[in-house]
């Protein structure tokens, strides 16, 4: 599941800030924060779950095509989620290409990942084997 920064509107950011700010005037800060922030967090979760579920399903299909089984699937699933998060955070363009190239180098050297499979994962997520979407 996605962790970290996802695109949020200013009204979503303000709603979360207001819920946290109002909670600090209450002696039971932790429970108040959680109860006030829960609706905003649930909405964000429901908004982003379909995107990242689709990424997992699409990457899984690519891995099946390449015959990758067992624990090695986790390597490529993790790579796919990182690419999807980067696309969600920074959008397409040169910054995404740089991020993808860095992640590919890391996954190849650290996990001995197959560059062809990594390219296929990038292609299924961004629509381009290089990650550059114009």
Curated annotation (Swiss-Prot):
- Where does the record place it? Virion
Q: What GO terms fall under cellular component here? A: helical viral capsid
Family annotation (Gene3D superfamilies): 1.20.58.800
One GO molecular-function entry:
DNA binding
| Domain of life of the organism encoding this protein | Viruses
Q: What is known of its domains?
A: The N-terminus projects into a DNA groove.
Name the chain's protein.
Putative capsid protein
Which species expresses this protein natively?
Sulfolobus islandicus rod-shaped virus 1
Q: What is the lineage of its organism?
A: Viruses, Adnaviria, Zilligvirae, Taleaviricota, Tokiviricetes
């Amino acid at each position: 599941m996605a962790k970290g920064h996802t695109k949020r509107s200013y009204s979503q950011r303000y709603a979360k800030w207001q819920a946290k700010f109002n909670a600090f005037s209450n002696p039971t800060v932790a429970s108040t924060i959680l109860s006030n922030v829960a609706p905003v967090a649930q909405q964000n979760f429901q908004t982003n779950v379909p995107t990242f579920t689709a990424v997992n399903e699409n990457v899984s299909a690519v891995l099946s095509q390449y015959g990758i089984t067992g624990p090695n699937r986790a390597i490529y699933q993790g790579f796919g989620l990182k690419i999807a998060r980067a696309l969600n955070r920074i959008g397409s363009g040169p910054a995404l290409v740089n991020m993808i190239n860095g992640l590919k180098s890391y996954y190849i050297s650290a996990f001995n990942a197959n560059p062809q499979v990594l390219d296929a994962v990038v292609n299924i997520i961004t629509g381009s084997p290089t990650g550059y979407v114009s």
